[in-house]
Design a protein with these regions (language model features):
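Conserved catalytic or regulatory cores that recognize and/or transform ribose-phosphate-containing ligands
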Residues: 1-131
Length: 131
């Protein structure tokens, strides 16, 4: 089994936290130099992976929000969204309480489309490792 690790990229550490918890194969789309070939590979992986995970840790993850809603419509049974409020290096939380409500609405929308919605990386890892 393989999972695509989509979602927030810029200055987010969630992949470093999740990857050691996974007992399955994964595709990490984050690269230092994004090219059209990288975009093509990402689209291929979203099609071929057993699950596509979108973890949102910042409210400005607008493209990731579009991707998760797109996938929750096109392939709801293999789409997972996780909204988690990451702690920044300065000790503050990355997402305000108001913005958490907005992202929660995105998660609930994806869930209504038939996708899975989790609120922690632990829940995501437990689910994927038990599939």
């Amino acid at each position: 089994m393989r999972v695509f690790l989509g979602g927030t990229c810029a200055n987010s550490e969630w992949r470093k936290e999740l990857i050691p918890m996974l007992n399955i194969d994964y595709f990490n789309p984050v690269v230092s130099n994004w090219t059209p070939e990288c975009q093509d590979e990402e689209l291929k992986q979203r099609e071929t992976c057993d699950y596509v995970l979108y973890t949102l840790t910042r409210v400005f993850s607008t493209y990731s929000i579009a991707e998760v809603i797109d996938d929750s419509n096109k392939r709801p049974k293999k789409t997972i969204i996780c909204i988690t409020n990451e702690k920044l290096k300065n000790g503050k939380l990355a997402i305000s309480s108001q913005d958490i409500k907005h992202l929660d609405a995105v998660g609930r929308l994806a869930e209504r489309n038939g996708s899975l919605y989790f609120k922690s990386l632990d829940e995501v890892a437990k689910y994927l490792n038990n599939k």
